[in-house]
């Protein structure tokens, strides 16, 4: 059994770690509230944009935009949204596992994949496991802006425009609630039609002013940008929630470990006192 002094040292070490994890839990909770507000503020715009685009995909358009056309799939692209920091449980690895399974399915069909990475964890992961990374951006912090995301988005849209990509997806974590975050892979291009059964029964016609080509070119790029930005802010809210839960679990585990060490310490101290008493009694008997 370890000595009492050594056990006291372990208890002090765990207590120090517990203070750190508790502080990180509180910081994550504060950041989560802010990121939830940012997510809630942008979600109506992203959802409305998705609905309008769904109508367009079902509409009788004067100008058929290339983003509406299905192609024979030879290469697909993924915009992968991850975190810049760790200590957020299995948030990133669960997302990467989902993506790898998807990529394996395409590979079995002879389809190649390109990756545009957002966040240092994705860059580190695919730097280790391999993958055709064509763009990446890291270090966006807790308040990402659309201007920081333009680089990877522009690279993937250009590849799609030039016919080098036949499908484009965004891979991110969807914020369900504080305890639940769900990895999701959402198709961006070609535009998926509206999923609502009632909408599919309707025929959507639009009048364009001044020119349908200019209007649709702008609208469809805004659509992609809005979905990517929404994916990033939802992933950020998921990150802070996952970190808060992970740090709370670490703090609770630290408390349990301290109780166990305290019990071991008491036993060690009791054994030491018993040993001393035995030695005193033995010495007195010898005299």
From Swiss-Prot:
<comment type="subunit">
    <text>F-type ATPases have 2 components, CF(1) - the catalytic core - and CF(0) - the membrane proton channel. CF(1) has five subunits: alpha(3), beta(3), gamma(1), delta(1), epsilon(1). CF(0) has three main subunits: a, b and c.</text>
</comment>
<dbReference type="Pfam" id="PF00231">
    <property type="entry name" value="ATP-synt"/>
</dbReference>
<dbReference type="GO" id="GO:0005886">
    <property type="term" value="C:plasma membrane"/>
</dbReference>
<keyword id="KW-0813">Transport</keyword>
<dbReference type="InterPro" id="IPR035968">
    <property type="entry name" value="ATP_synth_F1_ATPase_gsu"/>
</dbReference>
<keyword id="KW-0139">CF(1)</keyword>
<keyword id="KW-0066">ATP synthesis</keyword>
<comment type="similarity">
    <text>Belongs to the ATPase gamma chain family.</text>
</comment>
<dbReference type="GO" id="GO:0045259">
    <property type="term" value="C:proton-transporting ATP synthase complex"/>
</dbReference>
<protein>
    <recommendedName>
        <fullName>ATP synthase gamma chain</fullName>
    </recommendedName>
</protein>
<keyword id="KW-0997">Cell inner membrane</keyword>
<dbReference type="InterPro" id="IPR000131">
    <property type="entry name" value="ATP_synth_F1_gsu"/>
</dbReference>
<dbReference type="InterPro" id="IPR023632">
    <property type="entry name" value="ATP_synth_F1_gsu_CS"/>
</dbReference>
<dbReference type="GO" id="GO:0005524">
    <property type="term" value="F:ATP binding"/>
</dbReference>
<comment type="function">
    <text>Produces ATP from ADP in the presence of a proton gradient across the membrane. The gamma chain is believed to be important in regulating ATPase activity and the flow of protons through the CF(0) complex.</text>
</comment>
<dbReference type="GO" id="GO:0046933">
    <property type="term" value="F:proton-transporting ATP synthase activity, rotational mechanism"/>
</dbReference>
<keyword id="KW-0375">Hydrogen ion transport</keyword>
<keyword id="KW-1003">Cell membrane</keyword>
<dbReference type="GO" id="GO:0042777">
    <property type="term" value="P:proton motive force-driven plasma membrane ATP synthesis"/>
</dbReference>
<keyword id="KW-0472">Membrane</keyword>
<keyword id="KW-0406">Ion transport</keyword>
């Amino acid at each position: 059994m370890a000595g009492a002094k050594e056990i006291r040292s372990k208890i002090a070490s765990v207590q120090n770690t517990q203070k750190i994890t508790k502080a990180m839990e509180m910081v994550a909770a504060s950041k989560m509230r802010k990121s939830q507000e940012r997510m809630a503020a942008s979600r109506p715009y992203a959802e409305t944009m998705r609905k309008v685009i769904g109508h367009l995909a079902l509409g009788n358009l004067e100008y058929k935009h290339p983003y509406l056309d299905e192609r024979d799939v030879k290469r697909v692209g993924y915009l992968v949204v991850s975190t810049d920091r760790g200590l957020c449980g299995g948030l990133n690895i669960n997302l990467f596992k989902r993506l790898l399974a998807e990529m394996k399915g395409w590979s079995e069909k002879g389809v190649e994949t390109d990756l545009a990475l957002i966040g240092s964890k994705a860059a580190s992961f695919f730097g280790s496991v391999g993958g055709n990374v064509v763009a990446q951006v890291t270090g966006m912090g807790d308040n990402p802006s659309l201007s920081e995301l333009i680089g990877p988005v522009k690279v993937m849209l250009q590849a799609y425009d030039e016919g080098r990509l036949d499908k484009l997806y965004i891979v991110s974590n969807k914020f369900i609630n504080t305890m639940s975050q769900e990895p999701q892979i959402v198709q961006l291009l070609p535009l998926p039609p509206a999923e609502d059964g009632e909408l599919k029964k309707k025929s959507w016609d639009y009048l364009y002013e001044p020119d349908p080509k200019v209007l649709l070119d702008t609208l469809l790029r805004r659509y992609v940008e809005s979905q990517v930005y929404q994916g990033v802010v939802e992933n950020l809210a998921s990150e802070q929630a996952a970190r808060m839960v992970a740090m709370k679990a670490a703090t609770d585990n630290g408390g349990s470990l301290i109780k166990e060490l305290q019990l071991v310490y008491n036993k060690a101290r009791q054994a030491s006192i018993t040993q001393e008493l035995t030695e005193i009694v033995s010495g007195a008997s010898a005299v």
